[in-house]
């Protein structure tokens, strides 16, 4: 049991194991890299202070999961490059997120590694494309980088239809990989997320 900062009067129950510890470590890696990226872009000393706070944990995770940390670091570097070069190849750009998430979801090298990488790859591409679609109007106004802007210029009439088909295709591949995994606990909840929940931002 633990005390939630938002609801301090009531004890909460948490189930913790090696898998939840791994998820927490991966979240910290991503948070650390995002803070570092914000510090580079904004020169925010608040972000830099948070990076310093997380330094020790980041080093610990790096020694424990070098493959995953290397994948996230490579992703951040490549993403910076494609944005700087104003890359318009949507598949290439979205694939960077897919490759990174594939490595993060692949906790261990075992018989399910390839399937988890495939699941993460298509989930990552879906997430990138969904974010790009959601931010499209704002990015266009601010003239910020977004590979969908060039696509819309090339085929304005079919733009929304194409985006929907692309997102559906990514999630279909993701769902196929999910169904091949031996998931028994909370499978229905996860299916609900994959088949319905992920579309909430689009709709």
Annotated model-derived regions:
Residues 1-118, 125, 129-168, 176-189, ...:
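Acidic catalytic motifs of isoprenoid enzymes
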């Amino acid at each position: 049991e633990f005390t939630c900062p938002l609801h301090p009067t009531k004890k909460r129950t948490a189930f913790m194991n090696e898998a939840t510890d791994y998820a927490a470590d991966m979240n910290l890696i991503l948070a650390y890299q995002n803070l570092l990226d914000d510090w580079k872009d904004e020169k925010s000393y608040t972000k830099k202070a948070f990076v310093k706070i997380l330094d020790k944990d980041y080093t610990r995770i790096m020694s424990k999961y070098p493959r995953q940390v290397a994948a996230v670091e490579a992703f951040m570097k490549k993403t910076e490059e494609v944005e700087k070069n104003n890359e318009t190849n949507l598949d290439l750009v979205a694939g960077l997120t897919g490759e990174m998430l594939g490595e993060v979801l692949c906790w261990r090298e075992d018989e399910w590694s390839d399937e988890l990488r495939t699941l993460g790859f298509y989930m990552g591409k879906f997430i990138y494309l969904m974010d790009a679609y959601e931010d499209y109007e704002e990015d266009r106004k601010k003239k910020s980088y977004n590979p969908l802007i060039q696509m819309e210029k090339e085929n304005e009439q079919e733009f929304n239809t194409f985006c929907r088909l692309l997102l559906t295709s990514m999630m279909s591949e993701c769902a196929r990989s999910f169904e091949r995994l031996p998931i028994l606990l909370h499978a229905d909840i996860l299916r609900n997320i994959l088949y319905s929940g992920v579309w909430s931002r689009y709709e």
